Design a protein with these regions (language model features):
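Structural signal for interior beta-strand "rungs" in well-ordered beta-sheet cores
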Residues: 1-186
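Terminal amphipathic alpha-helical/low-complexity segments used for targeting or macromolecular assembly
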Residues: 1-5, 10-11, 16-17, 53, ...
Length: 281
């Protein structure tokens, strides 16, 4: 299971079922769980914890120092869950300040040459395509899809089931359930394909699908300000039997409200309106 040319520090903790390919280097403080397969020419170092049944492809570099001049050599972490695919030459840097972590959840796919900067958090079932660069402190919610060859600014949040088109520049938050594309990035439409694949177009959940479409038109195609749109949606969600009363819309509204706080980047605007440039909702 361990190729004789692999260099594994005696202090590393590898489950007996872990496979390690030729010329891979694994550092002293690394922990790797059962069933994980590490291919050839991989470097895993630092305080890195990797769960079960992951596949790490040739050339990946995980747990090395952050690309941050503030880093002083402190104990910082990379935590990776289970069932992730980490393809060729992916880089995942550990966090910057003592005790902090860069986190990758479960069932994620990081395609070749993707970069996950320090302190990033990727939840579950996220797909990051080839050549994507995530700056520090980017947070990506579950089931988001990030197309290839694009950059995401530090501290940006990308919402659940969002879709980001290739070669975009993402410098502000991407709201959940939206399709975003462009340089600079703009909200173009609902992520209709993603919502359908998630089952929201089925008859039992069609009211959720319909409510999100109505909310999109209100937020991005009306003449209302963001504050007015959010006030309207918040009031509607409180009404008994309202079609706007569901967990998906609640999450969208909460995301936008939080995004507009002074410590956040603010949400991306729509393609033809500037209303989402407002802050401090």
């Amino acid at each position: 299971l361990i190729h004789p040319t692999a260099v594994i520090h005696a202090g590393a903790q590898l489950h007996p079922t872990v496979q390690v390919g030729p010329y891979t280097v694994i550092g002293e403080r690394v922990k790797i769980g059962p069933g994980t397969i590490v291919a050839s020419h991989v470097v895993i170092d630092g305080w890195t914890e990797i769960g079960a049944n992951n596949r790490i492809f040739p050339g990946a570099a995980i747990g090395l120092e952050p690309q941050d001049l503030k880093y002083d050599g402190s104990l910082t972490l990379v935590k990776i869950g289970d069932h992730n695919l980490i393809r060729e030459y992916v880089t995942i840097n550990r966090a910057t300040l003592s005790g902090e972590a860069t986190v990758l959840g479960n069932h994620n796919l990081l395609m070749a040459y993707a970069h996950v900067g320090h302190n990033c958090v990727l939840e579950d079932q996220v797909i990051i395509a080839n050549g994507v660069a995530l700056a520090g402190h980017v947070y990506i919610e579950s089931m988001a899809r990030i197309s290839g060859v694009l950059g995401v600014h530090q501290f940006v949040h990308i919402g659940r089931l969002a879709m980001v088109g290739g070669m975009s520049r993402i410098d502000r938050d991407v709201p959940p359930f939206m399709l975003v594309e462009g340089n600079p990035g703009r909200v173009r439409s609902l992520n209709l394909v993603g919502l359908k694949r998630a089952g929201l177009a089925e008859s039992t959940k069609s009211h959720i699908y319909s409510s999100l479409k109505k909310a999109f038109r209100l937020l991005y195609r009306s003449q209302l300000t963001l504050q007015q749109s959010l006030d309207y949606l918040s009031n509607e969600m409180k009404q008994e039997g309202s079609p706007y009363s569901n967990d998906y819309l609640t999450h969208l509204v909460a995301f936008l409200v939080n995004s507009c706080q002074s410590n956040r980047r603010g949400p991306l605007p729509g393609r033809s309106t500037g209303q989402l440039l407002e802050r401090n909702v």
